[in-house]
Amino acid sequence: MMITRGGAKAAKSLLVAAGPRLFSTVRTVSSHEALSASHILKPGVTSAWIWTRAPTIGGMRFASTITLGEKTPMKEEDANQKKTENESTGGDAAGGNNKGDKGIASYWGVEPNKITKEDGSEWKWNCFRPWETYKADITIDLKKHHVPTTFLDRIAYWTVKSLRWPTDLFFQRRYGCRAMMLETVAAVPGMVGGMLLHCKSLRRFEQSGGWIKALLEEAENERMHLMTFMEVAKPKWYERALVITVQGVFFNAYFLGYLISPKFAHRMVGYLEEEAIHSYTEFLKELDKGNIENVPAPAIAIDYWRLPADATLRDVVMVVRADEAHHRDVNHFASDIHYQGRELKEAPAPIGYH
């Protein structure tokens, strides 16, 4: 009797729980039908289907349709998980969990500004911009020479003269390759001096008087000389190896020299620029004699120095020689400032001196 009553109660519980599903007049809808009907009748509302388990029917599943606008435990859980991941990524990237932070996986693909020339055509160079171009002052005095008067001046002068002999022996009259080698060396002092002045400005919490910018401009100008002559002279493999060796030695030597005596370092660069003027003068003589072909100027040189479209290699050598004369003046001026017992910041730097 007790077993019969217990069985009846269990059966009643099963009927109450399963009745709405087993004895409902509503037809079960498949996933395909649910998606099709929802799209046809309610094009603005997207439907999806999920599987649900009956509470007391072991292993039985039924399909039902819901709209995406309705909240379900599964969707709320997914949304919370994504929110947590975004906050975690943003916190790792920004160093905190500030509200509104957005995690970025990569910054690749920053779009540059579109730049055009004065005539409206597209600017094709990425290594320099139109506002960095200029017309070289070729009327500058090329024959000026600083007479060495002090012991350091004489050391600087004869150091540069001693470097000329192996250069003449190696390159002889191959002035294109000679110019390439010269520019790989001449581009180092401005960068070293600007870097050391930059660190000094940070260390002392003081301005540089514009000399950081002036020296870095010099280094960039010399680098553009190299990029230009690379279009004219194609260096051989052993010349490239020589460039690596010479640049490595000269960079470290000039770095130490500038730390020990800036006035000596600038004086030596001034004499080095005087030798560069001499080399480019000889280059022009060979062009005028016809020993070197006066080929059309590279496109990069025409845009950088604002040369006419029909400019030739001779025009390029002329403007490069004028640049070297300006660098000569800047470095002798910097050395004179130090000789007077003053710092570079006390005298205005010749920024934009071309």
From Swiss-Prot:
Resulting phenotype, residue 177 to A: No effect on stimulation by pyruvate
Record GO terms (molecular function): alternative oxidase activity; metal ion binding; superoxide-generating NADPH oxidase activity; ubiquinol:oxygen oxidoreductase activity
Transit peptide: 1-62
Cofactor binding note: Binds 2 iron ions per subunit.
Enzyme Commission code: 1.10.3.11
Membrane-traversing stretches: 179-199, 241-261
Outcome of substituting residue 127 to E/D/R/K: Active enzyme insensitive to stimulation by pyruvate
InterPro entries according to UniProt: AOX, AOX_sf
Outcome (variant: residue 352 to E): Increased resistance to a substrate-analog inhibitor
Localization in the cell: Mitochondrion inner membrane
Modulation of this protein's activity: When the two monomeric subunits are covalently linked by a S-S bond, the enzyme is essentially inactive. When the disulfide bond is reduced, its component sulfhydryls can associate with K-keto acids through formation of a thiohemiacetal, resulting in enzyme activation. Activated by glyoxylate, irrespective to the substitution found at Cys-127. That suggests the presence of a second activation site, possibly Cys-177.
Positions annotated to bind Fe cation 1: 183, 222, 225, 324
Compositional bias of kind Basic and acidic residues: 72-86
Tissues where this protein is expressed: Expressed in roots, stems, cotyledons, leaves and flowers. High expression in sepals.
Keyword Cell cycle among record annotations: no
Keywords, sorted A to Z: Disulfide bond, Electron transport, Iron, Membrane, Metal-binding, Mitochondrion, Mitochondrion inner membrane, Oxidoreductase, Respiratory chain, Transit peptide, Transmembrane, Transmembrane helix, Transport
Phenotype on disruption: No visible phenotype under normal growth conditions. Decreased operating efficiency of photosystem II and an enhanced activity of cyclic electron transport around photosystem I. Altered photosynthetic carbon metabolism when grown under high CO(2) concentrations.
Inducing or repressing factors: Up-regulated by antimycin A, low-nitrogen and salt stresses, high light, H(2)O(2), ethylene, paraquat, rotenone, salicylic acid, malonate,erythromycin and cold treatments.
Topology versus the membrane: Multi-pass membrane protein
Gene Ontology biological-process annotations: cellular respiration; mitochondria-nucleus signaling pathway; response to cold
More details: Cys-127 is involved in the sulfhydryl/disulfide regulation system, but is not required for subunit dimerization. Presence of a positive charge at this residue 127 confers activity while an uncharged substitution creates an inactive enzyme.
Function of the protein: Catalyzes the cyanide-resistant oxidation of ubiquinol and the reduction of molecular oxygen to water, but does not translocate protons and consequently is not linked to oxidative phosphorylation. Increases respiration when the cytochrome respiratory pathway is restricted, or in response to low temperatures.
Name of the protein this chain belongs to: Ubiquinol oxidase 1a, mitochondrial
Organism of derivation: Arabidopsis thaliana (Mouse-ear cress)
